[in-house]
Amino acid sequence: MASITELIKQLRASTQAGFMDCKKALEATNNDIDQAIKWLRENGIAKAAKKVDNVASEGVIKLKLADQKATILEINSQTDFVTKNDQFVAFSNELVDLVHKHETTDVAKIEQLKLASGSTVAETQIHLTAIIGEKISLRRVAFVKEEANSSLATYLHSNSRIGVIVKTSKTDDKEFLKHLAMHIAASNPKFVSQKDVSADFIAKEREIAAAQAQSENKPKEFIDRIVDGRINKVLEEVCLVNQKFLVNQEQTVQQAAQAKKVEILSFIRYEVGEGIEKQVSNFADEVKAQMK
């Protein structure tokens, strides 16, 4: 019969749980490894429940382009350190394959899908939260199909924090598509062109520009003209086709695309944590949180 030290070693290897947690689990289950794993999972889930309200604003972007379709998703953690954890990496890789296969963007439905382990995505997230000690959650998913008259390209930045899918008219110029996707990642446009800009966006920007002009004590008779100029500048910044192409600053993206006889149809750009308000805590609060 294996010694208690050997059992603890086996249990730690199987669950990644801490030494004392493994010791308690074995004591509670009369040194039965299988029951101890179950005990740790049950208690781990209980511990994980304390973390579900934590803000997970770090994480990774995952991309997959295959079979004439592209999938992009964001998985969040509380710190970027976790993104290098082997179990987190394995989970995120398996998850993007699963989502790509099922062609769904509904997070609630995805969380009920089963992974190779037999556990659902939701169960696995809770399990990872328990053993890693940080909230792990799938935040959002997008999915794009490539039709006969279109082409897709993807780009994932080296730190896996920014990912892009871009869809254009049909082209075999893979280098241009790659550069276009990289440009979108770096320049962060909000729209393809001005026709995609909402009236609400323009109205809000006009309000901001007018307030700025008034605060600068510009003559009232010139304010409308100043506002128009600033709106045009904003549209240059937020519309992809109006931006200077990073590969060749002498051209706009539109001019570069026209030279290649390519029409840009749509794009999706994900950046980790965008739109999430991050938690700010002082050192004392962090210590207290660790002691709970």
From Swiss-Prot:
Q: Which UniProt keywords are given for this protein, alphabetically ordered?
A: Cytoplasm, Elongation factor, Protein biosynthesis
> Is rRNA processing included in the keywords of this UniProt record?
no
* Alphabetical list of PANTHER family matching this protein: ELONGATION FACTOR TS, ELONGATION FACTOR TS, MITOCHONDRIAL
Which HAMAP family does the entry link to?
EF_Ts (MF_00050)
Q: Which family does it belong to?
A: Belongs to the EF-Ts family.
Task: Give the matching NCBIfam families.
Answer: tsf
Under what name is this protein listed?
Answer: Elongation factor Ts
**Species of origin:** Mycoplasmoides gallisepticum (strain R(low / passage 15 / clone 2))
